[in-house]
């Protein structure tokens, strides 16, 4: 708001007090004139502010979409829920417990016979592999990571707030670097780092149905800092070795939802201009992040050249995790997390990308992915072209069965 606008607002308020105490047509006319001027000035200042704000979002898609969401009406929190027997929850504690049980039901049951070979945790011996030896966690690196923490974020179950860690970055850097190095070199993660407070976020549908909520984990900020250090080295390794598929646009540097759409749209319009038809299949996986098999993910991590104590550390990071659901300060009982990559963690999205990374190798049709959202398409001129697309869909079905990531048929569409 400009100084001119603030000055006119004070004048408007003064004229209103005069009109209130000495009511007359003249006084009201003076007040009305300034009031209308203030309305125009405020509208002008708001427009200018939005223009400056939108200009600052250039190249920052995440901030832009966050701003758009902030303008929309925020959905209410968890309401009264109804369980499978038609019973309505009466307290926040009951709602938290019901949601916790609902989240537990989607987990993938691991095959006890499917064990990862012990030698995978051995030291790095070949080029194209990465182990704990490639990650040097110095006090300087830790301090820089602590200073990047956002103070407005929430803490995990340990109640160590990011504001505290950021303010004490210089003092915490040395002890934390020692803890991080010991954790990495032993391939173990402290059990306190594997706890999560889960916030249920409503998606769509009936708010009384617990199945219409998704879990987002609030985990230890201390652990998140270490995750960020490990993640940066993993991304560097994957980019250097060319392991990540170019079809993936989710959570990757220089690729976004927009690049995904533009590349697909250009391909489709080019085909149409050349006289082809285009059949597109939009695919979605059911509870994708929560149903990732840990043992199968560890196999894929090894396939990407992740070995040694680093491989063990990620394995320990994923296993024996526990979570509890919170609803307005009331919590459910702690329950073990049997599968999935924790939503809300730093490493989770990257681990999921690695899990679905080989998907394009199973088909011949064109494909684009944004995390778990997948679309495949083919140029159609004769019947056989459609048959090829169907064979690719069947192949993806076999991939789904092998890796235990099931299709959400309700969200799969054909265009």
Feature-to-residue mapping (PLM):
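Active-site-proximal segment of RNA-dependent polymerases
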Residues: 111-142, 188, 193-197, 236-291, ...
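Mobile genetic element proteins and their domesticated derivatives, centered on retroelements
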Residues: 12, 38, 68, 103, ...
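Short, conserved micro-motifs composed of acidic
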Residues: 329, 391, 405-415
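Catalytic palm subdomain of template-directed nucleic-acid polymerases
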Residues: 288-304, 374-401
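Conserved catalytic palm subdomain of right-hand nucleotidyl-transferase polymerases, strongest
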Residues: 152-160, 209-218, 259-302
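Surface-exposed loop/turn segments and immediately adjacent short secondary-structure elements
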Residues: 4, 62-212, 217, 225, ...
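Short amphipathic alpha-helical coiled-coil/interface segments
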Residues: 5-13, 28-46, 61, 103, ...
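Active-site palm subdomain of RNA-directed nucleic acid polymerases
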Residues: 230-248, 349-377
């Amino acid at each position: 708001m400009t100084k001119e606008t603030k000055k006119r607002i004070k004048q408007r308020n003064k004229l209103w007090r005069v009109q209130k105490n000495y009511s007359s047509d003249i006084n009201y006319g003076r007040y009305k004139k300034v009031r209308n001027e203030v309305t125009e000035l405020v509208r002008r200042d708001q427009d200018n502010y939005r223009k400056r704000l939108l200009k600052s979002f250039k190249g920052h898609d995440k901030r832009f979409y966050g701003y758009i969401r902030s303008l929309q009406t925020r959905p209410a929190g968890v309401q009264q829920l109804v369980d499978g027997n038609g019973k309505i929850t009466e307290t926040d504690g009951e709602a938290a417990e019901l949601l916790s049980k609902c989240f537990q039901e989607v987990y993938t049951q691991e095959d006890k016979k499917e064990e990862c070979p012990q030698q995978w945790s051995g030291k790095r011996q070949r080029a194209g592999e990465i182990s704990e030896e490639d990650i040097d966690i110095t006090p300087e690196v830790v301090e820089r990571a602590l200073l990047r923490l956002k103070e407005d974020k929430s803490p995990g179950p340990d109640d160590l707030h990011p504001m505290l860690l950021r303010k004490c970055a210089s003092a915490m850097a040395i002890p934390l670097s020692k803890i991080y190095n010991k954790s990495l070199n032993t391939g173990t993660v402290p059990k306190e780092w594997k706890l999560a407070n889960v916030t249920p976020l409503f998606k769509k549908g009936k708010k009384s149905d617990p199945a219409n909520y998704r879990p987002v984990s609030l985990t230890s900020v201390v652990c998140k800092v270490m995750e960020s250090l490990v993640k940066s080295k993993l991304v560097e390794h994957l980019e250097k070795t060319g392991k990540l598929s170019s079809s993936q646009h989710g959570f990757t540097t220089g690729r976004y939802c927009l690049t995904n759409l533009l590349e697909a749209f250009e391909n489709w319009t080019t085909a149409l201009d050349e006289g082809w038809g285009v059949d597109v299949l939009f695919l979605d996986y059911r509870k994708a992040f929560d149903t990732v098999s840990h043992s199968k993910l560890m196999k894929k991590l090894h396939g990407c050249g992740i070995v040694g104590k680093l491989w063990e550390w990620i394995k320990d990071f994923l296993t024996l995790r526990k979570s509890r659901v919170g609803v307005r300060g009331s919590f459910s009982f702690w329950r073990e997390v049997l599968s999935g990559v924790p939503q809300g963690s730093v490493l989770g999205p990257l681990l999921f990308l690695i899990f679905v990374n080989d998907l394009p190798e199973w088909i011949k049709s064109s494909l684009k992915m944004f995390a778990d959202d997948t679309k495949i398409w083919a140029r159609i001129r004769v019947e056989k072209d459609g048959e090829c697309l169907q064979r690719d869909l069947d192949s993806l079905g076999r991939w789904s069965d092998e890796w235990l990531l099931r299709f959400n048929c309700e969200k799969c569409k054909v265009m």
